[in-house]
Amino acid sequence: VRSQRMKTELITNVSHDLKTPLTAITTYIELLEDDNLATEVRKEYLGVLKRKSERLKFLIEDLFEVSKASSGNVTLNLVEVDICNLMRQVYLEYEDRVEEADLIFRFRMPEEKVTLQLDSQKTYRIFENLYVNIIKYAMPHTRVYVNANKTKKGIVIELKNMSANELNIQPEELTERFVRGDSARNTEGSGLGLAIARSFAELQGGKLSVEIDWDLFKVVIVFQA
């Protein structure tokens, strides 16, 4: 029953997410057909068209990524990756957005370098998706904790934040396709971020799980050495 419900929700949500930018694009194209439009208004409409087109492009790319990952039809380029350094690099790319979201990140990493055989691009995407998810859904003016602990077999990474939304959802559902933490779907995004992150972790022999304790949201990633 749960599986059928999630399939129905998936179809409904993907239809909604594809239709919304397409409808906007069609509407603004029709508006641009007016020869009497002022230059400034025309520029404004073209700007909206560009943003909606990019939104549609990103959604389709995410669909393609998660489809490939689910089928296992992905080529991995395994190299030595300094996992903690990569996590910091991704954070620096999004530091401005973190400040805009009024969040404070706290990192606790091993003092020694932890290198693993990973696909650096796909591992970057894992943490990019996780940070973006936190920026979108974390409660403003709170701390985000990113902890990495080296083990005999590899590394365990935890990302913890307080959610701005009530999390009335099963943790495992959040890593399914098109499931979001905000049931009202008020934030932009494909709803595929956590699903892609989990798929890319699993493709590299790792694990990604979600834990929820009231409004505390935690993602745990395990990579083997």
Where are these regions (language model features)?
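Glycine-rich ATP-binding loops of the HATPase_c
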Residues: G205-W214
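Conserved catalytic submotifs in the C-terminal HATPase_c
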Residues: N77-E80, E99, I104-V114
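Conserved micro-motifs of the catalytic ATP-binding
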Residues: S71-L76, T115-D119
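Short conserved segment of the HATPase_c
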Residues: E166-V179
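A conserved beta-strand-to-alpha-helix junction within the catalytic ATP-binding
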Residues: N77-Y91
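Short beta-strand/loop element within the Bergerat-fold HATPase_c
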Residues: H141-K153
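Short helix-loop "hinge" at the ATP-lid/N-box region of the Bergerat-fold HATPase_c
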Residues: I134-I135
